[in-house]
Amino acid sequence: MLNRLGFVGLILLLAGSFAVTTASAADRERVTQFDVHVGDAFMLSIGTPAVDIAEAPNGDTIELIFTGQIDVKGHEAEGSGGFRHLDKKGNPVDFGTFTAKRLMSFVDYGPAAGGPPTFHRGRAQIKVRAVGQMGSFNAIMFVDCKFGPAPPPPPEFEEGTFFRIEGGLDFHENANEVNIFNLFVAVTDKERH
């Protein structure tokens, strides 16, 4: 009886150490770098409309395009995009460009079942510096991607790109007339360099 318990204990010990080894290997394989696509040429090439539109509480809208990269480990972001701010009647207020400065946060929901393994869903907050015709300003760009049906992201999660101007308007409502998709494409160090 004691030998049997000793054998079972040894098996459990080995199984536990294997599980720890497997988890450590999975952690080393975790993707931490992504290309970010918001209404850009890549998205257009796979059949989604260019430009992502968000609305502020006063009815103003902002159209956004962005192509960039994020590195989760270093909280780094790079890339550039364009914006066009319209009032609630559709009249131009401002337009210009913006540059990613820093990744504030990123949650990776992983690839969707049935989709390409490099196409990840997630939520990023990226600090940007914008230069428009009316002046320059800082903003936070929120990029949400819920590509694919399963497993589902949290219920409050909405596909879209949102733009909060520091000391200004918060474009936090999806205003797209057609279904827009954003995308995080996983890349490896080898692909990046």
Task: Report the location of each language-model feature.
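Bacterial N-terminal signal peptides
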Residues: 8-17
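N-terminal segment immediately downstream of the Sec signal-peptide cleavage site
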Residues: 23-106, 169-193
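Short polybasic amphipathic segments
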Residues: 80-84, 124-126, 161
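Acidic, glycine-rich flexible loop segments
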Residues: 112-158
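Low-complexity, intrinsically disordered Gly/Pro/Thr-rich segments
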Residues: 158-173
